[in-house]
Amino acid sequence: MYDVIVVGAGWCGLAAAKTYLQTCPTARLLVVDGDSSIGGTWSKERLYPHLVAEAHYGLFEFSDLPMRREGILPDGRIPSAAVHAYLTEYATKFGLLPRIRLNTWIEDIRQDPTAIGDDKAPYWTLQVAGSSQPLQARKLIIATGLTSEPRMPSFPGREDFEGHVLHSKMMGRADTGKLLNDPSIRHVVVYGGSKSAFDAVYLLLRAGKTVDWVIREGGGGPSIMTPLNILGQPSFRLNNSRVMSLFSPNPFEVAGERSWWQRVMHQRAGTFAQLLVVWFWRVLAYLLQRPWKYDYSVNGKQLKPILGLDSVLWSPATLGVMTHPTLWEDIHSGERVTIRRQNITALGQNKHVVLSNGDRITADMVVCATGWHARHSLFTPDEQLAVGLPSTSSFDPKSQAHWLNLQKAADEEILEEFPLLQNCPIALPPVRCEDDHHLYRFVAPSSGPLAQERLIAYVGFLRTTGAPIVYEAQSLWATAYLTGALHVPALEEREKEVARTNAWIRRRYICGRKVPFALFDFLPYVDMLYRDLGVNSRRKKNAVSE
């Protein structure tokens, strides 16, 4: 019986395990991961040639271990191997390696109320794939994040397709490497418009392949790709500054204690203040998009953000850093890559890929850069609801009515508090309350027996661009929560807060309607976590430095 099991050995899991052990050094703690090496997204089996981190050197590290300069590219880009080496060094420095069990894929997690340990406390049972011996723990930290379960489209005719079909997650596998070097694999279709699609296209072109890049019509469009540098600084540094959150209406400050800026620019925003905020984001969008010259070619036009200069403000698609700017030369030349805004409707014989306009493409391989599942198969659908996760299952009628009422009230409150959010150009679709993450502070279940007994916490379940900064704060909050050292408000207040933050995300970020998202607001979120803990998160000597 373990005191704590951490599921996931990437950035989130390592931060969570280290933080918990520093607080409780005698705890029996185990970290499990299904891969054969640590790193999560940056594990060895998920690395492939030319894969580079979006963050610049110095902006992708934990606060207690600087990243070594060895292996860093001259312009400050961080190759994937350097990220993996850094995480290995981190796990070594803090004594985590002996506590990590790799090649351990968790199939199912259950918390049986009748299962009581020797200390009369309930415990979790984790079923390991290929093993008849389950793992048991008193408490859990789920640190798999939001990019662990690939979303694979279900293509009609897949069984008749003679080519290869794989998710972009598999690009680093040895068998995928063999396909890249196979001269019989000449033509590849890449499906999707995310940052991983840009990376896949670049890799395939460097491997000598011809690419048809198909981006789904009717979705959020291609990712908004930022240049490596903006105004002489790494673009990631700008996004990691408080300047961005100044112009982004967010709910993370204490009600009644908001800064004069938040009150004037967002809460009481008149026409002039709203115009100022909108034009800040439009100027930024112009600076981000100008280097790519979208209108220069037919291909380039297919990659234009769907909301133009308003795309950064409302984020219909995720933001990415163009880690390989020379890809634009290939895009504009159109010699070996063709970009299409269509849906793939079917696969078929003779290696045919059928598009929604009736066109047929012959392809030896299809790479699906189609993102990740928001639901987590570690738990059954009913258990997903109990632990605060989205689910295809439904609440009982009473709970459903309760959450729908909270949802409606929270949406009205957010729109009244932040008038700018009433102007989102894409209407909010109907929302099931079961599709939300019901996690207080995006870390702990908001309600139910599990919340009362503090048996489970999450790290990495809010998508941001400030990964290490956020994971450290979440890990400390989760540790304090699980050990009973953190005061949390009463049930009613927690549930209102969860409904409120979910409503804000849906209104603030169009792409946040799929997963929890705080692109430009993660520093106020981190401030909030540390405020809960009684820690001052503003430690620089003046407001300008902050």
Curated annotation (Swiss-Prot):
Belongs to the FAD-binding monooxygenase family. The keyword Cell membrane does not apply. FAD binds at I106. Glycans are attached at N239, N343. Residues 1-17 form the signal peptide. FAD-dependent monooxygenase; part of the gene cluster that mediates the biosynthesis of the tetrahydropyranyl antifungal agent lanomycin that acts as an inhibitor of CYP51 and blocks the ergosterol biosynthesis. This is FAD-dependent monooxygenase. GO terms for molecular function: monooxygenase activity. Its cofactor is FAD. The keyword Secreted does not apply. It comes from the Eukaryota. Its EC number is 1.-.-.-. Pathway: Antifungal biosynthesis. PANTHER family: DIMETHYLANILINE MONOOXYGENASE (PTHR23023). Keywords: FAD, Flavoprotein, Glycoprotein, Monooxygenase, Oxidoreductase, Signal.
